[in-house]
Amino acid sequence: MIIEQVVGNIDNISDEILNKLHLENVFVESSNLVKKVQRVVTDHGREIGICLNGQKDLSPGDILYMDERDIIVLNVIPDDLLVIRPSSLRQMGDIAHKIGNRHIPAQFDEIEMLVQYDYLVEELLKQLEVPYTRENKKVKLAFRHVGHSHG
Protein backbone atom coordinates (compact mmCIF):
# COMPACT_ATOMS: atom_id res chain seq x y z
CA MET A 1 0.00 0.00 0.00
CA ILE A 2 1.34 3.44 -0.96
CA ILE A 3 0.12 6.53 0.94
CA GLU A 4 0.38 9.77 -1.04
CA GLN A 5 -1.58 12.07 1.25
CA VAL A 6 -2.87 12.28 4.80
CA VAL A 7 -6.63 11.73 5.06
CA GLY A 8 -7.12 13.76 8.25
CA ASN A 9 -6.34 13.56 11.95
CA ILE A 10 -7.82 11.15 14.46
CA ASP A 11 -8.59 14.07 16.81
CA ASN A 12 -11.28 15.12 14.31
CA ILE A 13 -13.01 11.71 14.15
CA SER A 14 -15.86 11.01 16.55
CA ASP A 15 -15.69 8.09 18.97
CA GLU A 16 -18.87 6.76 17.36
CA ILE A 17 -17.10 6.38 14.03
CA LEU A 18 -13.83 5.13 15.56
CA ASN A 19 -15.59 2.37 17.48
CA LYS A 20 -16.81 0.91 14.18
CA LEU A 21 -13.35 0.76 12.60
CA HIS A 22 -10.45 -1.67 12.85
CA LEU A 23 -7.56 0.49 14.12
CA GLU A 24 -3.95 -0.08 13.10
CA ASN A 25 -1.11 2.12 14.33
CA VAL A 26 2.18 3.10 12.75
CA PHE A 27 4.83 4.12 15.27
CA VAL A 28 7.66 6.40 14.08
CA GLU A 29 10.44 8.34 15.74
CA SER A 30 9.83 12.09 15.88
CA SER A 31 12.71 12.63 13.43
CA ASN A 32 10.68 10.75 10.79
CA LEU A 33 7.83 13.28 10.92
CA VAL A 34 9.72 15.39 8.36
CA LYS A 35 10.44 12.54 5.94
CA LYS A 36 8.29 12.66 2.81
CA VAL A 37 9.30 9.17 1.65
CA GLN A 38 9.57 6.24 4.05
CA ARG A 39 8.57 2.63 4.55
CA VAL A 40 6.74 1.69 7.75
CA VAL A 41 4.94 -1.30 9.23
CA THR A 42 1.71 -1.15 11.24
CA ASP A 43 1.33 -2.82 14.62
CA HIS A 44 -0.60 -5.54 12.73
CA GLY A 45 2.28 -6.23 10.34
CA ARG A 46 0.96 -4.40 7.27
CA GLU A 47 3.79 -2.80 5.26
CA ILE A 48 3.10 0.71 4.00
CA GLY A 49 5.04 3.07 1.77
CA ILE A 50 4.62 6.77 2.46
CA CYS A 51 5.34 9.10 -0.45
CA LEU A 52 3.94 12.57 0.30
CA ASN A 53 3.89 15.12 -2.48
CA GLY A 54 4.72 18.59 -1.18
CA GLN A 55 2.62 18.16 1.93
CA LYS A 56 3.41 19.60 5.33
CA ASP A 57 5.24 17.44 7.85
CA LEU A 58 3.47 14.48 9.39
CA SER A 59 1.85 14.94 12.81
CA PRO A 60 0.89 12.53 15.58
CA GLY A 61 -2.64 11.29 14.95
CA ASP A 62 -2.50 11.74 11.17
CA ILE A 63 -4.76 9.26 9.39
CA LEU A 64 -2.74 7.54 6.68
CA TYR A 65 -5.62 5.40 5.42
CA MET A 66 -9.33 5.09 6.14
CA ASP A 67 -12.22 3.22 4.55
CA GLU A 68 -15.52 1.84 5.88
CA ARG A 69 -13.71 -0.90 7.87
CA ASP A 70 -10.13 0.13 8.57
CA ILE A 71 -8.17 3.13 9.78
CA ILE A 72 -4.38 3.46 9.96
CA VAL A 73 -3.07 6.17 12.28
CA LEU A 74 0.42 7.60 12.74
CA ASN A 75 1.82 7.74 16.28
CA VAL A 76 5.13 9.00 17.64
CA ILE A 77 7.49 7.00 19.82
CA PRO A 78 8.39 8.98 22.96
CA ASP A 79 11.76 10.75 22.83
CA ASP A 80 14.38 10.71 25.59
CA LEU A 81 14.23 14.39 26.56
CA LEU A 82 15.61 16.92 28.96
CA VAL A 83 12.60 18.94 30.11
CA ILE A 84 14.00 22.25 31.27
CA ARG A 85 11.97 24.43 33.64
CA PRO A 86 13.97 27.59 34.37
CA SER A 87 13.00 29.42 37.55
CA SER A 88 13.26 32.90 36.01
CA LEU A 89 13.19 34.69 32.68
CA ARG A 90 16.89 35.47 33.08
CA GLN A 91 17.69 31.80 33.65
CA MET A 92 15.59 30.87 30.58
CA GLY A 93 17.42 33.38 28.40
CA ASP A 94 20.81 32.25 29.68
CA ILE A 95 20.25 28.53 29.15
CA ALA A 96 18.50 29.06 25.79
CA HIS A 97 21.49 31.11 24.61
CA LYS A 98 24.01 28.49 25.76
CA ILE A 99 22.06 25.62 24.19
CA GLY A 100 21.61 27.62 20.99
CA ASN A 101 25.36 28.21 20.79
CA ARG A 102 25.77 24.43 20.74
CA HIS A 103 23.34 24.26 17.78
CA ILE A 104 21.05 21.89 19.66
CA PRO A 105 17.45 21.96 18.41
CA ALA A 106 14.89 22.88 21.07
CA GLN A 107 11.13 23.10 21.39
CA PHE A 108 9.20 25.36 23.72
CA ASP A 109 5.81 25.48 25.33
CA GLU A 110 4.43 27.88 27.94
CA ILE A 111 6.79 26.92 30.76
CA GLU A 112 9.20 24.31 29.42
CA MET A 113 12.07 23.98 27.02
CA LEU A 114 12.55 20.52 25.48
CA VAL A 115 15.81 19.18 24.06
CA GLN A 116 16.76 15.65 23.12
CA TYR A 117 18.85 14.01 25.80
CA ASP A 118 22.54 14.89 25.66
CA TYR A 119 24.84 14.19 28.59
CA LEU A 120 26.79 17.41 27.95
CA VAL A 121 23.61 19.50 28.14
CA GLU A 122 22.66 17.64 31.32
CA GLU A 123 26.06 18.51 32.83
CA LEU A 124 25.56 22.16 31.84
CA LEU A 125 22.12 22.23 33.49
CA LYS A 126 23.58 20.78 36.69
CA GLN A 127 26.49 23.23 36.64
CA LEU A 128 24.15 26.23 36.18
CA GLU A 129 21.61 24.80 38.66
CA VAL A 130 18.78 25.01 36.13
CA PRO A 131 15.78 22.86 37.15
CA TYR A 132 15.17 19.99 34.73
CA THR A 133 13.99 16.41 34.51
CA ARG A 134 14.83 13.61 32.12
CA GLU A 135 11.63 12.19 30.64
CA ASN A 136 10.38 9.95 27.87
CA LYS A 137 7.83 12.18 26.20
CA LYS A 138 6.01 12.33 22.87
CA VAL A 139 6.61 15.48 20.84
CA LYS A 140 4.35 16.82 18.11
CA LEU A 141 7.15 18.14 15.91
CA ALA A 142 10.50 16.83 14.80
CA PHE A 143 13.60 18.42 16.28
CA ARG A 144 15.08 20.26 13.30
CA HIS A 145 18.72 21.04 12.83
CA VAL A 146 18.94 24.43 11.14
CA GLY A 147 21.90 25.07 8.91
CA HIS A 148 23.67 28.41 9.17
CA SER A 149 27.02 30.11 8.89
CA HIS A 150 28.94 32.61 10.99
CA GLY A 151 30.33 34.47 8.03
Curated annotation (Swiss-Prot):
Keyword annotations from UniProtKB, A to Z: Chaperone, Cytoplasm, Nickel, Nickel insertion
Cited Pfam families: UreE_C, UreE_N
Organism of derivation: Lachnoclostridium phytofermentans (strain ATCC 700394 / DSM 18823 / ISDg)
CDD domains attached to this UniProt entry: UreE
GO molecular function, one term: unfolded protein binding
The name this protein goes by in its record: Urease accessory protein UreE
Principal cellular location given in the protein's record: cytoplasm
InterPro entries for this protein: UreE (IPR012406), UreE_C_dom (IPR007864), UreE_N (IPR004029), UreE_N_sf (IPR036118)
Subcellular localization: Cytoplasm
One BP annotation, GO: protein-containing complex assembly
Protein role: Involved in urease metallocenter assembly. Binds nickel. Probably functions as a nickel donor during metallocenter assembly.
Cellular component per GO, a single term: cytoplasm
Gene: ureE
UniProt KW Chaperone keyword: yes
Keyword Chaperone: yes
Family: Belongs to the UreE family.
